[in-house]
Design a protein with these regions (language model features):
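Acidic-glycine-rich active-site phosphate/pyrophosphate-binding loop
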Residues: 1-5, 32-49, 122-129
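Polybasic, low-complexity association/targeting segments
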Residues: 1-20
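Short alpha-helical scaffolding segments that buttress acidic/His motifs in well-ordered protein cores
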Residues: 14, 28, 46-51, 151
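Short cysteine clusters
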Residues: 24, 62, 112
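Amphipathic alpha-helical interface segments
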Residues: 30-34, 69-72, 86-163, 167-175
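Transmembrane alpha-helix interface/packing and boundary motifs in multi-pass membrane proteins
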Residues: 50-59
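Catalytic phosphate/nucleotide-handling subdomain of diverse soluble enzymes
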Residues: 63, 67-76
Length: 175
């Protein structure tokens, strides 16, 4: 797949996963991993609690942003053996900051609660069956699944662009 096909595929997969079973963090992360050929269910499992602003609270940032940031960190983050080396995390932090910037430019905020209020006029408590029904009626599955796809696409583009820079630096000069 070329870059554009990969970006479309990650959008399609992330959106489809979100529509099928939800959990914005896991859906964005899973789609990115699949398009890049990564199989790591432990990392996907670790994303579970980030859904809907952490624990369905709405009071944290969007789970799609969390899952996509986890994907960036998976490829560019520092390892446990480097925890004492502050500089080892800089690359992942700068890339995560770029994703956050793009996300806020696109959606005006990164807080799940605020995104829901902006898109649907209110926040939905997804632990409450009446709110769950109201969310479906308001179009939340379609709206959030599109957001999840867009966020996964943003993150994948950042990953691919950063990898291309790294590959260019390691190319041997033509003699």
């Amino acid at each position: 797949m070329n870059t554009e096909e990969m970006l479309e595929e990650v959008f399609r997969r992330a959106k489809a996963y979100e529509l099928r079973g939800g959990n914005c963090a896991q859906c964005s992360l899973s789609a990115i991993f699949e398009v890049l050929g990564v199989e790591d269910d432990n990392v996907v499992r670790a994303a579970t609690g980030f859904a809907d602003g952490v624990g369905l609270s709405g009071d944290g940032h969007c789970g799609a942003l969390s899952g996509s940031t986890m994907a960036i960190s998976y490829f560019f983050g520092r390892k446990k053996e480097d925890l004492a080396r502050l500089g080892k995390q800089l690359r992942a932090l700068l890339l995560a900051k770029e994703l956050h910037k793009q996300f806020v430019e696109e959606f005006s905020t990164c807080r799940c609660y605020d995104i829901q209020v902006k898109k649907y006029g209110r926040f939905f408590n997804l632990y409450n069956m009446e709110d769950m029904k109201a969310a479906v009626e308001a179009g939340m599955p379609e709206g959030c699944s599109t957001l999840v796809g867009q966020t996964a696409r943003m993150a994948l583009k950042i990953i691919l662009d950063e990898q291309a820079k790294k590959d260019k630096k390691t190319e041997l000069p033509v003699v």
